[in-house]
């Protein structure tokens, strides 16, 4: 969210002395007067003034997590769990009600990285907790990526894991959910993933962007 207007209504206090903020060499703005507007248990909101090279002034408001361990590579992980079961390839999905969206949301399993964990360790743990599936094989880990960089610095790594769906421990997966979580687990054949996502009733369920991008990538690979 940003406003580059110079009117007094854009959030910039014209009477406040500009306290400059250190910026990277490739930042095209002068930043000043950074402040925490609200600080909660899980997140905080901040705003910072900015000035363009033409002298236009605005304010940028953003949201930041309070939970990221200092040593963590990202805030969290999203997990692409490929389940091979009875000769077929499935993707593990989760469905849960998201209060900010006001709807059910179809997603990849995901979660925050705990202190002392790597992204891969967090992925294995979160997969077990959210879905009950057990995996000991990490196929790949992505580089750091940001989820909505115009609004937040919330970040993740994508971790791809393989799951033996025929193994005894994966015959009847048991979730290990927090007391406030309500998550439904689905197995969808990878070859039918895009069709499954496309045919959802969008009036009652939405699709998380990382999952949609993955489904579109699978579809485009066959074109």
Swiss-Prot record:
Cofactor(s) named in the record: Mg(2+); Mn(2+)
Sorted UniProt keywords: Hydrolase, Magnesium, Manganese, Metal-binding
GO BP term (any one): ribose phosphate metabolic process
Domain Nudix hydrolase per the UniProt entry, residue ranges: 72-213
Enzyme category, top tier: hydrolase
One Gene Ontology term of the molecular function aspect: ADP-ribose diphosphatase activity
PROSITE patterns the UniProt entry points to: NUDIX (PS51462), NUDIX_BOX (PS00893)
Metal-binding listed as a keyword: yes
Any Pfam family matching the protein: NUDIX
CC per GO annotation: nucleus
Locus of motif Nudix box: 111-132
Binding-site residues, Mg(2+): 126, 130
Family membership noted in the UniProt record: Belongs to the Nudix hydrolase family.
Biological role stated in the UniProt entry: Probably mediates the hydrolysis of some nucleoside diphosphate derivatives.
Listed name of the protein: Putative nudix hydrolase 2
Organism encoding this protein: Caenorhabditis elegans
């Amino acid at each position: 969210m940003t406003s580059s207007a110079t009117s007094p209504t854009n959030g910039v206090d014209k009477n406040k002395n500009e306290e400059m903020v250190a910026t990277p060499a490739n930042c095209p703005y002068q930043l000043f007067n950074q402040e925490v507007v609200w600080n909660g248990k899980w997140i905080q909101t901040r705003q910072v003034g900015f000035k363009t090279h033409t002298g236009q002034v605005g304010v940028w408001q953003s949201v930041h997590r309070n939970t990221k361990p200092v040593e963590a590579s990202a805030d969290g992980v999203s997990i692409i769990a490929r389940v091979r079961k009875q000769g077929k390839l499935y993707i593990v999905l989760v469905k849960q009600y998201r209060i900010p969206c006001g709807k059910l949301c179809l997603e990849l399993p995901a979660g925050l990285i705990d202190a002392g964990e790597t992204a891969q360790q967090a992925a294995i743990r979160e997969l077990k907790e959210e879905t009950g599936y057990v995996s000991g094989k990490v196929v790949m880990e992505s580089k750091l990526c940001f989820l909505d960089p115009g609004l937040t610095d919330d970040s993740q790594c994508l971790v791809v894991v393989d799951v033996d769906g025929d193994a005894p421990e994966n015959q009847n997966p048991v979730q290990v959910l927090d007391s406030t979580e309500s998550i439904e687990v689905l197995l969808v054949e990878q070859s039918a993933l895009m069709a499954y996502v496309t045919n959802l009733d969008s009036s009652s369920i939405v699709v998380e962007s990382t999952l949609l991008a993955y489904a579109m990538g699978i579809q485009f690979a066959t074109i």
